[in-house]
């Protein structure tokens, strides 16, 4: 089974503006290493010429941050400074507007949301944008699933653990509801949930982080898992739960409804 995650998606596109290694030199980083977005990127220019000989459109992959320039909110000062610097170096929509070719763009990897400003910045030669956390969807902008988290360091084998589980027959859940999430990423949405279900014999509440094997084991042992909004509307937990054939419990939101209407029925 090919599991959905950002790096796997980037490999399906004609050109990706991020390195696959998630690495700066010999140091692994939380961010994918960015490639230059601009006409000075000769590797990209050569790929455009190559693809144009075959068809009149090209598929591109980029992180959410460098898709277009906009104001960033609800970020700490360090992250905001880093993200703004990345946008100043170049954005994909601006680059596409300077080229005589059609493009279809896919995004993943970072959870910075897509806001209303994007609709005025999409050039005519961009046919469609499939973007994660596309809160302002519609027109050429289509919501896309976040999927699983990419490998973040050399010893990160979470994807392999899920693949191993899925290679075996599913088990029958023995309990009803599992709760395990940090509260600091979104206190407004997450504070108080543990207390609602704590002490119920049909629910398991983990207040502390557990190992990934144990985390997945608990998901499989329960029919449902509470999946509150974190840094963004969509999160990796939702897709871990779905891949393990359990039901994520989420607060109703138009974006999540739009996303699930086209995706969840196919899983």
Question: Which residues make up each language-model segment?
Answer:
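Nucleotide-sugar donor-binding catalytic core of glycosyltransferases
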Residues: 1-239, 243-263
């Amino acid at each position: 089974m090919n599991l959905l995650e950002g790096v796997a998606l980037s490999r399906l596109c004609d050109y990706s503006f991020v390195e696959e290694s998630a690495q700066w030199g010999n140091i692994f980083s939380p961010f994918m290493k960015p490639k230059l977005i601009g006409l000075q990127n000769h590797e990209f220019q050569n790929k455009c010429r190559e693809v144009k000989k075959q068809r009149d459109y090209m598929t591109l992959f980029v992180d959410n941050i460098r898709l277009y320039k906009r104001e960033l909110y609800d970020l700490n000062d360090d992250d905001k400074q880093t993200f703004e610097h990345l946008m100043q170096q170049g954005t994909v929509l601006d680059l596409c507007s300077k080229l005589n070719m059609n493009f279809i763009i896919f995004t993943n990897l970072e959870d910075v949301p897509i806001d209303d400003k994007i609709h005025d910045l999409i050039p005519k030669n961009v046919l469609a944008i499939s973007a994660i956390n596309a809160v302002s969807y519609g027109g050429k902008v289509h919501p896309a699933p976040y999927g699983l988290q990419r490998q973040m360091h050399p010893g990160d084998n979470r994807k392999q653990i899920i693949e191993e589980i899925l290679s075996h027959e599913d088990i029958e859940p023995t309990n009803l509801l599992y709760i395990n999430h940090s509260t600091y990423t979104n206190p407004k949405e997450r504070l108080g949930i543990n207390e609602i279900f704590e002490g119920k014999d049909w629910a398991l509440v983990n207040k502390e982080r557990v190992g990934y094997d144990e985390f997945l084991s608990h998901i499989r042992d329960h029919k449902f898992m509470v999946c509150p909004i974190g840094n963004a509307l969509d999160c990796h937990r939702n897709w871990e739960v779905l891949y393990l054939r359990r039901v994520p419990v989420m607060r109703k939101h138009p974006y999540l409804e739009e996303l699930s209407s086209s995706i969840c029925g196919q899983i």
